Amino acid sequence: MALSVASFSMASVSATQAATDMNEVTAASQSKISLEQALALANKAVKGDIISADFDQEDRNENSHYDIKIVTNNNEQEVSVNANTGKVTKGDTERLDKEDLAEYKAMKQAKVSLSQAIKKANQTLKGKVLEVEFDMDFGKPVYKVEIGKGNQIHKVVVDSMTGKITRSQVSDVDRDD
């Protein structure tokens, strides 16, 4: 009996996640500000190196925003950009720890910028970029980009040294109800 309850719970979580993803893709596609525009607005407000950005949907798109992290003077500054108005709000600032500093140094050595990685990942898809981040993937410095198009989320990994797409995966987020 416990096994079937656990299976049902996992199915509920998956269905809820799919609905959330679909709502987020829809909200992002309807937002007036793109992730690329949000990056420019955030970098105008806080000068530094953008290390990640992601779309966050709240309250039926009224408060949808982009959460952006910018490194400046070995500190990580959180910035929020309203996805409909472009209003920039500064958030918390944290000192980078050793692991984050090592990752940041790897990003600084990258031959491909975050903006170039976004363009490369979205070159053929022409969807709405939902998320981008610099990361170490199996010891290699990469950019991970999520793009929403239709009822799918495309997860693309771009090598930060060559600009080549090393991995691409599609998730269907359409609800089955």
In which residue ranges do the predicted regions lie?
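Long, terminal "pre-/pro-" and other extracytoplasmic accessory regions
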Residues: 1-177
